[in-house]
């Protein structure tokens, strides 16, 4: 599995964290999440899989929490790993990020996740906006 970002530090212990993220295209645009804290950045909607939770259940839950949208027809297109510090949890993690393409159905209200805003952006600009290089690379490959 391809790794993005910095290599793991030999002396550091990393908690395993599996996550699911969605590329949500509609009419030439992508639905992204802008997270205000701890560092403002654009992200693919998604996040961690809770213990015992099915990845697709987590994907639907995370997209809804971060964007307010329901989704349909998710299809896995790739995965990557990264070793990173997660300040919101105050821990170092080995993240396995599964990426799906899904169809956004319609909004059911604002994002429920504090500090998150759902943003529609032209698809060709999304690659440059995304803070995480693995996500940006998979979006770029999808758009080719």
Positions of PLM-derived features:
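Conserved Nudix-box catalytic region and its N-terminal flanking loop in Nudix hydrolases
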Residues: 25-66
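Residues embedded in well-ordered beta-strands
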Residues: 21-23, 29-31, 98-101
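Local beta-strand/beta-hairpin segments that build beta-sheet-rich folds
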Residues: 1, 77-78
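A residue-level structural signature of the nucleotidyltransferase/glycosyltransferase Rossmann-like core
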Residues: 14-15, 22, 41, 118-119
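Acidic, metal-coordinating catalytic segment for phosphate/diphosphate chemistry
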Residues: 1-21
């Amino acid at each position: 599995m391809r790794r993005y970002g910095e290599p793991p530090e030999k002396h550091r212990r990393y908690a395993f964290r599996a996550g699911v993220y969605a590329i949500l295209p509609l009419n030439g645009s992508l639905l992204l999440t802008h997270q205000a804290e701890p560092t403002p950045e654009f992200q693919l909607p998604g996040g961690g899989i809770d213990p015992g939770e099915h990845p697709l259940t987590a994907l639907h839950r995370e997209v809804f929490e971060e964007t307010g949208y329901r989704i349909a027809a998710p299809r896995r297109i790739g995965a990557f790993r990264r070793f990173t510090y997660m300040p919101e949890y105050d821990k170092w993690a080995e993240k396995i990020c599964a990426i799906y393409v899904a169809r956004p159905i319609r909004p059911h209200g604002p994002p429920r996740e504090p500090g998150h805003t759902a943003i529609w952006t032209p698809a060709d600009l999304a690659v440059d906006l995304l803070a995480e290089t693995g996500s940006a690379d998979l979006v770029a490959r999808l758009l080719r």
